[in-house]
Every structure is written in structure tokens, then in C-alpha cells.
Amino acid sequence: MRECISVHVGQAGVQMGNACWELYCLEHGIQPDGQMPSDKTIGGGDDSFTTFFSETGAGKHVPRAVFVDLEPTVIDEVRAGTYRQLFHPEQLITGKEDAANNYARGHYTIGKEIIDPVLDRIRKLADQCTGLQGFLVFHSFGGGTGSGFTSLLMERLSVDYGKKSKLEFSIYPAPQVSTAVVEPYNSILTTHTTLEHSDCAFMVDNEAIYDICRRNLDIERPTYTNLNRLISQIVSSITASLRFDGALNVDLTEFQTNLVPYPRIHFPLATYAPVISAEKAYHEQLSVSEITNACFEPANQMVKCDPRHGKYMACCLLYRGDVVPKDVNAAIAAIKTKRTIQFVDWCPTGFKVGINYQPPTAVPGGDLAKVQRAVCMLSNTTAIAEAWARLDHKFDLMYAKRAFVHWYVGEGMEEGEFSEAREDMAALEKDYEEVGIDSYEDEDEGEEY
């Protein structure tokens, strides 16, 4: 089988992990103690879920996941929570003191004490796999563990498992809801370090998710649980093709092949529809064309940026539920005619489509309604450079005054790393700019005679 190992790093990664595994269990009919009710006999029926769960001799299903945090409180909640029996206790790894929102602590001083036990555990999980496909790494950009430890881990995973794909789900620091002043520093340091190690990174902007919760679900003051449940639906849509059989199945490497035109430009924009509360869904029937249209609304994106100002390089539509290719083709044709979607001229306007017949699952007591069909769109657009520009600007404001830098230097970093990381980000912005430039402009000279 094509197994995937999930690694959840830091508070954000662990809490996203809780939401995701809760949803996976519901989708596959696995109980919180890891048992699958007896009607699904071992080896009978659909075994695609083994990409994410391993099965013990006793018929218990254990997630192929590792939870890591440099301080124990968040993972202690998992150890005492509803799903405490689901995870192998050794897959929940905690340190003693936290990274204090400091990239240098997560990457150098404290991270290096815990990296070996973590890699050991990952090695054991990898040994149980018959054909390991890759890693899904969940973390935030802003925290110390999420930024520092993740970048350390990605470097080591590249050494140990060179050819395996590594996909990230990263929480991008939100302008309004900031948990730390130094988020821009951490974000830029971690992006610079992991840029060459990550194959594909799905960014999730907290503010964008907040707005979706407020606007579409009528939650006045969304909590992290609300945000994570929405994020888990998106992660589930992206990974559904690995866990279920469908008409058009997509695997991890296929995403990269279709979404990443150049190795550095690997930050697809995710959009999910329909996000709708239970009382609204009761009164509306959402057709394939409606949810497909909703994907092109900037309001439904996971990162705040405006694709109408950018150009698309690639576009993947992942449908699940009651969807037939005929409807999809009609919906896409309609969008091509009426939407002003600009593709870069070196990329023909292809939409890659995946369809999974498993309808989306709603978490009992959650905010999202149970719907018949849903779609997740992954598009690689030059507009996401706006997000980097925002972050770089904040970095510059602080770094011009060398504010807070002594905390990083005190943990053994050199100031040169800051400027090096910032230059790399400037190069990334430039890359995005160049990708969007039409290719025929620079060829004109050669064609005069």
C-alpha cells in the first residue's frame, strides 16, 4: 500500500492533528479505541484506509502519526482526551521546556535534544510500511516549535528519506489574531530553511479561516476548535484520494506533478466549498456548478490574497460525494466562459479533476452541515506572493531596528541567518513575479527577421 506518515509539530500541529484524526476515524468508522466494528472483517471490503492506519493483530487500528511538542501541556490533553486509546503512547513525544516562540530554541538548543527520539519513532513507523509514500507535516509558521523544530525535522527527513515526498500543512500567521510579536521572524526563518526540503506546502491563513467561520457559519467568536474542524475538512479532502477508492484517484506525487511547475513555487492555494451551517443547508441544495463556482470566490480561500490579480499556473479540483464527471465538465466549461481566470501563457488551461464517491463526513456537534457533495480546489497562483510580501514587510519593520534579535542570537543563532533568510524570501517573491511574466515578451526580438 501507499502509506503516509503524519507528523504534527507544536501546539498548532497537534491541535490540527486532533481535528484531523477525529474526522478520519468518523470517515472510516473507526471507534475512539481504535476498533472497527466487526462487520468490516479484516481484509474484507475497502482497505484503502491502511494508508493512514496500521492494523494490529488484535484488530485495533493505530494512526500512522507522530505528535511532537517541546512542552507537554498540549499533548497531555491528547493523552487524557477522547482518543487517548487510539494513539500509541510512544507516538506522543514531549519535551520538558517549550520553545518560547523562539525559532532558535526550536531549531538549535531545545529541538536538538528531542530530534533523535522523534526520528527513531518515525523510523519505526516507516518500517511498518510496505511502500511508504511520504510525510505530511502539520505545523504553524509563527510558533517556536512549529517553525524551528519543523525546519530541523525536514532537514533530517531529507537526509534519511531522500526521495520520499514531504507535504506541509502550515498555519500562516494572521494579521489580526497574532499569538506572538516575533511571528514574522519565525515564519521567514522556517520558510527559508524548509524551502528546499518541502515538496508542496498548503498554507492556511488563520484570519481567512476566522472570516469563513464568521461569515458562512455565523460563529461570532470562532475558537481554535472551530478553525481546526474546518481545516480538517480541507486536509481530509486533499487526502481522501489516498484513503478511499474513487473514479479518478490522485496520490501524493500526482499533486506535486500537477501543481508544482518549479521546485520553489510549491505553495498551492486551497479553497473549500461548501462551508455552510446546518440550518442553512437544510434549505439549500448545492449543485456541482454552485460549489465549483464558490471555489473561485476569494472569500472561500484559505489564504487572503486575490487570484484575480494573479495568474494561475495549475488548478486541481477534488470533488467528493455525489458527483459525476458530466456535471464537473459542464461546471468547468461554464467557469472558463464566464470567469476571467487568467492562466500564465506557458501553461494551457487545464483543470485536473479528482472524484471520490465517499461523501463528506460531518463531525457530530460540529459547525459544518452534512452535505451530499463538496469540492476542494488546489490552485497554484502567483497571487499567493501577496502573502509573502505582507510577511516580509513586517519582518523588515522589526529587523530594521533589530528588535528582539538578541533572543535568537542568545540561543546560538547568528545575525547573518536573518539577512540570509530575508534575501531568500526576496528571491521567492521575485520568482513568483517572473513566473507571471508572459513568455512571448522576451522572444519578440528574435522573430523580427
Swiss-Prot record:
CDD domains: alpha_tubulin. GO terms for molecular function: GTP binding; hydrolase activity; metal ion binding; structural constituent of cytoskeleton. It is found in: Cytoplasm, Cytoskeleton. Transmembrane segments: none annotated. A motif (MREC motif) lies at residues 1-4. Its cofactor is Mg(2+). GO terms for biological process: microtubule-based process. The modification N6-acetyllysine is found at residue 40. Its EC number is 3.6.5.-. Mg(2+) binds at residue 71. SUPFAM superfamilies: Tubulin C-terminal domain-like, Tubulin nucleotide-binding domain-like. Some glutamate residues at the C-terminus are polyglycylated, resulting in polyglycine chains on the gamma-carboxyl group. Glycylation is mainly limited to tubulin incorporated into axonemes (cilia and flagella) whereas glutamylation is prevalent in neuronal cells, centrioles, axonemes, and the mitotic spindle. Both modifications can coexist on the same protein on adjacent residues, and lowering polyglycylation levels increases polyglutamylation, and reciprocally. The precise function of polyglycylation is still unclear. It catalyses: GTP + H2O = GDP + phosphate + H(+). Its main location: cytoplasm. InterPro entries: Alpha_tubulin, Tub_FtsZ_C, Tubulin, Tubulin/FtsZ-like_C, Tubulin/FtsZ_2-layer-sand-dom, Tubulin/FtsZ_GTPase_sf, Tubulin_C, Tubulin_CS. Belongs to the tubulin family. The MREC motif may be critical for tubulin autoregulation. This is Tubulin alpha chain. The lineage of its organism: Eukaryota, Metazoa, Chordata, Craniata, Vertebrata. The gene is tuba.
